Design a protein with these regions (language model features):
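Nucleotide-sugar-dependent
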Residues: 1-10, 20-24, 28-29
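An acidic- and aromatic-residue-enriched active-site/binding cleft used to recognize and process polar
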Residues: 24, 41-42, 77-78
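C-terminal amphipathic helix plus adjacent low-complexity
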Residues: 45-107
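A short alpha->beta transition loop at the rim of the catalytic pocket in nucleotide-sugar-dependent
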Residues: 15-17
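Conserved acidic donor-binding segment of nucleotide-sugar-dependent glycosyltransferases
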Residues: 6, 37-43, 54-58
């Protein structure tokens, strides 16, 4: 399911953790490779390789975590999400440019 993810991803990201995301979620449309680490769940070794790489390269993991934190707080904060709900419920049109696809929710 495109863009499906547990809300834990946003919680970890918002708390400054380096997140590892299955490529099948297609969250690459929302977060770049500089903001999250993507792995291929079809390749049983890929996740382990990436975990080991970032354990050995902590500064790189910290850089990605910082970038993800900044993106999360800039593009997906409580004010923007609340504004989005109000746009759908009341305005029936976007009042700002959102960082996620919106066309299926507006007439």
């Amino acid at each position: 399911l495109k863009y499906y993810s547990s809300d834990r991803i946003s919680q970890y990201l918002g708390n400054g953790s380096c997140i590892f995301v299955d490529k099948n979620s297609q969250l690459e449309d929302l977060f770049s490779n500089d903001e999250a680490v993507y792995f291929d769940s079809a390749d049983l070794n890929d996740f382990g390789k990436k975990i080991n790489y970032y354990v050995d390269n902590k500064n790189e993991a910290k850089r990605i975590a910082k970038n993800g934190w900044e993106r999360g707080h800039k593009s997906y904060n409580e004010k923007i999400v609340t504004n989005y709900f109000l746009d759908i419920a009341i305005n029936n049109k976007p009042s700002i440019e959102y960082s996620w696809p919106i066309n299926q929710y507006f007439l």
